[in-house]
Amino acid sequence: MDMQYRIAELHDLPAIVSIYNSTIAGRMVTADLEEISVESRLDWFQHHTEQRPLWVVEEDGIVLGWISLEPFYGRAAYHKTVEVSIYIHQDARGKGLGKDMLQFVLDQSEALDFKTVLGFVFGHNEPSIKLFERFGFERWAVMPNVAELDGIERDLVILGKRIRP
């Protein structure tokens, strides 16, 4: 794959939302239970900054996935910690793109001045947990039965990695 990573632009938002919405029905990735709209994600899109960006990954002008870095917990003392979200188009899943995307994030740590990365993953989402663990993330917390998806309670696993001192 000849992929390019770039900062997301407003015209990418429909593709970002489409990729996100494609994960909802599977009940493995997001706690949203119904599809979201482009309009409902405008504030989220606009709150990304140079230091906490939203990237798209594209090949031949087609968005294959996106990465969001967001501040953790919204308090000043946590400014060196980020929460990462990685979403991949259904046609691009299972081809190693997730590994490339997570490595891309880790490579940005110095330039974006973060030291710790967190991933919030449902406990039954073994592929995502394995991806993070492959990169040295550890299970820092398990929040048992905090989400209910179609009547089934699910755990939330917080995976963390300290990248640099």
Each model region followed by its residue ranges:
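A short beta-loop-alpha structural element at the N-terminal edge
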Residues: 4-16
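Conserved GNAT acetyl-CoA-binding A-motif
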Residues: 109-121
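Glycine-rich acetyl-CoA-binding "A-motif" of GNAT/NAT acetyltransferases
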Residues: 62-66, 127, 153
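Conserved beta-strand-loop-alpha-helix junction that forms the acyl-donor binding cleft
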Residues: 93, 119-129
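Conserved acetyl-CoA-binding loop-helix of GNAT-fold acetyltransferases
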Residues: 94-107, 129-134
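Acetyl-CoA-dependent GNAT
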Residues: 34-91, 102-103, 162-164
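Conserved catalytic-core motifs of GNAT/GCN5-like acyltransferases
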Residues: 71, 118-121, 138-155
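Conserved GNAT-fold acetyl-CoA-binding loop/helix
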Residues: 17-44
